[in-house]
């Protein structure tokens, strides 16, 4: 089969189309013919960062091929002997083996049955693939952690991005008042998602205008800020939140001092949110499937590439300015 192999850590050009063996499934896995693949900023981070490759991809050192990616939608073509959930021909999607080796940049993948769900018939493979890691992250941030409810005032940074555009839609689904923050070029797009207000981060500081938000979903990607300090965007976000509010960080890891200070000064709860394996993963992705099927959330696809153009897709995703999702089709 064809797959995109990472030849060495570095630039997008190190992602090479190659012939590799078809994966062999375990008893609890299904073989999926991949119809669509979604990529995320973390993909580019892992591609160019040895430590991230070792931690997030769980590099062992004896891999015949390093194949990145975690988000797919496709058709089940073979089932393991212990599989009871799926049968050949089922259309499925999911974010699987994260953290670990999903090897999703390929024509076929071997995936654990417990990390996939049935794709709704009225949802395309491309839209379903997009709504995996990104939509799950938005769900984890707003629903699981922040417990979003009707009339909550929510600020969503990065509202035009992969996670952000789902976050706006999920927040509106629950009846929240949404303030979207993104580049001014994307104002119409963000308001079109349902946001009630918009701020252009290039010309406006949200903290100069708002100090009573119930929830802030902060997805500003600053790789230098591994831990939060008073100089980070995360610290600025605290200024927009009312006493007793919630700060959900998607990228920056807030250190304990930052967390304790926010709690002591304004009773603000701060947490780093991600979609690493957890007990509610299956229910969460089922909820996403239901929202997709009902049209409550939609995947905006800004770029659609053939698998062979993975390097081009990475060039775009690593700018962190992509609108909505980037999808590839084998």
Predicted regions and their residues:
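A glycine-/small-residue-rich N-terminal strand-loop-strand element
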Residues: 71-98
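Glycine-rich phosphate-binding loop and adjacent beta-alpha segment
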Residues: 224-296, 330
């Amino acid at each position: 089969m064809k797959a995109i192999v990472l030849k060495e850590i570095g630039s997008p050009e190190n992602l090479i189309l190659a012939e590799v063996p078809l994966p062999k499934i375990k008893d609890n896995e299904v073989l999926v013919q991949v119809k669509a693949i979604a990529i995320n900023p973390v993909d580019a981070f892992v591609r160019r960062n040895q430590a991230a490759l070792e931690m997030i991809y769980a590099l062992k050192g004896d891999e015949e091929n390093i194949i990145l990616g975690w988000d797919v939608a496709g058709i089940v073509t073979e089932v393991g002997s212990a599989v009871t959930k799926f049968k050949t021909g089922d259309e499925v999607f999911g974010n699987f083996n994260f953290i670990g080796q999903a090897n999703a940049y390929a024509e076929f993948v071997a995936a654990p049955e417990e990390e996939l769900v049935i794709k709704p018939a009225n949802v395309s493979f491309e839209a379903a693939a997009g709504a995996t890691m990104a939509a799950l992250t938005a769900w984890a941030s707003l629903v699981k952690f922040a417990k979003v409810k009707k009339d909550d005032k929510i600020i969503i940074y990065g509202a035009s991005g992969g996670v952000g555009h789902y976050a706006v839609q999920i927040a509106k689904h629950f009846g929240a008042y949404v303030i979207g923050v993104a580049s001014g070029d994307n104002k119409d797009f963000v308001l079109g998602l349902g946001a009630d207000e918009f701020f252009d981060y290039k010309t406006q500081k949200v903290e100069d205008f708002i100090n009573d938000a119930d929830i802030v979903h902060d997805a500003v990607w600053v790789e230098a800020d591994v831990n939060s300090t008073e100089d980070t965007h995360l610290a600025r976000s605290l200024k927009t939140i009312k006493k007793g509010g919630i700060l959900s960080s998607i990228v920056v890891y807030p250190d304990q001092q930052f967390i304790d200070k926010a709690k002591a000064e304004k009773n603000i709860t701060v947490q780093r949110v991600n979609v690493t394996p957890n007990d509610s993963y299956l229910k969460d992705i089922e909820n996403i499937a239901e929202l997709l099927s009902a049209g409550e959330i939609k995947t905006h696809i800004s770029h659609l590439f053939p698998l062979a153009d993975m390097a081009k897709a990475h060039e775009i995703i690593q700018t962190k300015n992509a609108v909505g999702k980037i999808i590839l089709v084998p």
